């Protein structure tokens, strides 16, 4: 009997996020303890706009190397179709998780949303109403294709107006021509279908919203609300907020060292072997002098270069 009771309690605790639907501030704080910076009122980590701007130049390789070194091995998702494939998508994740529609669950979620939580319209609009500038809407639509799309050009325009960004969508979208016309709606999605989702629990139903800002699964990655989305070159990397500054700073240092190395190779001052291997003290000193001489011309903020130079001994 005690074993049964314990199992029941564990099951209930495990299901709390589902019944609560939107994650509580307390739970979000519990799941993101390594983030010590600013947060939104609901507890979502708020990485600064300045870091988001610098993140736009980071490559997947640079982000991957830093995160792998911190034992974060499953942060990269590939195999997407892309709107604006030559653009870069960067922002703070706001997540939504859908499951195949189930009438009884759908009804109680609708009832709670409309009567207790102040939600309006259908469930697919609820997370969108929460978006703010700099967010990226990240959706687990369980790969739904036909009758699966919850986003077309109407909601796409609303998302872009609120965030200035596109989306990451584990499923099919619709109105692809209209979404492309938005211009800056750089998005990563699995497929396209002209149909739309069905959300009537008393009629046709195929999708139910079960989580807002809960941990969700996107392409083999556990995505947390507040993770930084880096979408470029056909793939998406999700960076935990407490690693963002390290990723950005490392990327900038690598970028500067590459620029210096390439310039010196063109000048034939050093051999490829000297540049590819650990730099000697003389090369490091030359690099510091080069940074000082070009500090106003480099694609890294002057303040960041000055901070970097303070820590160098050459």
Say what each PLM segment does.
Residues 21-64:
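N-terminal pre-domain segments of enzymes
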Residues 44, 215, 234-236:
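Structural motif
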């Amino acid at each position: 009997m005690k074993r049964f009771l314990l199992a029941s309690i564990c099951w209930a605790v495990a299901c709390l996020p589902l019944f609560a639907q939107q994650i509580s501030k307390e739970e979000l704080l519990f799941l993101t303890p390594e983030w010590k910076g600013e947060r939104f009122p609901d507890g979502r980590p708020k990485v600064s706009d300045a870091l988001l701007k610098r993140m736009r130049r980071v490559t997947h390789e640079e982000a991957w190397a830093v995160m792998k070194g911190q034992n974060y091995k499953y942060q990269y998702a590939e195999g997407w179709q892309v709107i604006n494939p030559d653009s870069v998508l960067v922002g703070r994740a706001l997540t939504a998780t859908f499951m195949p529609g189930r009438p009884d669950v759908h009804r109680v979620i609708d009832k709670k949303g409309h009567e207790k939580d102040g939600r309006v319209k259908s469930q697919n609009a609820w997370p969108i109403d929460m978006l703010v500038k700099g967010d990226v809407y990240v959706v687990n639509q369980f790969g739904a294709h036909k009758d699966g799309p919850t986003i077309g050009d109407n909601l796409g325009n609303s998302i872009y107006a609120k965030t200035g960004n596109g989306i990451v969508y584990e499923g099919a979208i619709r109105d692809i021509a209209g979404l492309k016309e938005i211009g800056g709606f750089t998005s990563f999605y699995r497929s396209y279908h002209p149909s739309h989702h069905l959300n009537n629990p008393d009629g046709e139903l195929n999708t139910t919203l079960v989580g807002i800002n809960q941990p969700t699964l996107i392409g083999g990655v556990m995505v947390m609300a507040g993770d930084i989305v880096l979408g470029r070159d056909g793939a998406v990397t999700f960076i935990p907020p407490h690693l963002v500054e390290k990723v950005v700073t490392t990327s900038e240092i690598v970028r500067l060292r590459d620029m210096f190395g390439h310039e010196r190779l063109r000048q034939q001052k050093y051999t490829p072997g000297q540049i590819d291997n650990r730099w000697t003290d003389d090369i490091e000193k030359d690099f510091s002098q080069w940074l000082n001489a070009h500090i106003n011309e480099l694609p890294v903020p002057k303040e960041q270069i000055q901070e970097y130079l303070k820590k160098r001994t050459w």
